[in-house]
Design a protein with these regions (language model features):
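Eukaryote-biased activation of long, low-complexity terminal tails and linkers
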Residues: 1-227
Length: 227
């Protein structure tokens, strides 16, 4: 392709468990392979799955048949979606990204969400798939701001992540309108819709999708006046 002067890419590859003859490339190997001057800057993430649980955590609905994952993308990143972001993400400014899907077997901590907010300044949708509780329980940390976040989905996440985002002293979400969550998590974080620490964020929501049957108490409607 002699006329090609620009090639932007986002490549996600997986290696099956039964492919024992394949040698895995390291991050360093991948970076060296893109050193030629005609290539643009490239970022890469290489992960190894040691058991079915870890593999399931990383790739969610995909089969438990993989034992490694490699994500390579050109910089600047020109795509609107960033799929399967894990704790291996090293940061960087990806201004075009509007939607991020986070998943891992290890917990996402407060400081990592700070990296996410800085790396994706235009983020509008965040989906978190992580059943591990956070290890850092102190809430007197630096306030994190997601200035453009409109949609938050923590339905498949531990209750700690709902707390992380809904407590206004942890996260400032001035444009959040849509929340997807389990009823158990919502009732816990809001203390049955009486917690003042989550009231401000919840009061601005216009759409709440709740998994699980429930009879909303009177305080529910007062807590979500825009529903």
């Amino acid at each position: 392709m002699p006329r090609l002067n620009k090639f932007s890419f986002d490549i996600d590859t997986y290696v099956e468990k039964n492919n024992n003859q394949m040698d895995f490339s390291s991050n360093e190997d991948i970076q060296r392979s893109f050193k030629r001057k005609e290539y643009r800057s490239v970022s890469s993430i290489v992960e190894y799955f040691t058991n079915e649980k870890e593999c399931c955590c990383h790739i969610c609905a995909m089969p438990y048949q993989f034992r490694s994952r490699c994500h390579i993308y050109s910089l600047p990143y020109e795509f609107q979606d960033f799929p399967f972001l894990t704790n291996s993400f090293q940061g960087g400014i990806l201004e075009n990204v509007l939607s991020v899907f986070m998943t891992d077997c290890s917990s996402f901590e407060h400081n990592f969400f700070k990296v996410i907010s800085q790396s994706f300044p235009r983020l509008q949708q965040l989906i978190i798939f992580n059943g591990e509780p956070q290890k850092e329980k102190q809430r007197s940390m630096t306030l994190i701001k997601f200035a453009h976040l409109v949609i938050l989905d923590v339905e498949s996440a531990h209750t700690d992540y709902a707390e992380q985002f809904l407590i206004d002293k942890c996260c400032h979400l001035p444009r959040l309108l849509n929340l997807t969550i389990r009823y158990e998590s919502l009732a816990t974080v809001t203390n049955n819709f009486t917690n003042d620490a989550t009231r401000l964020t919840c009061s601005q929501l216009t759409n709440v999708k709740i998994r699980g049957l429930f009879v909303p108490p009177k305080s529910f409607h007062q807590y979500f006046p825009l529903l």
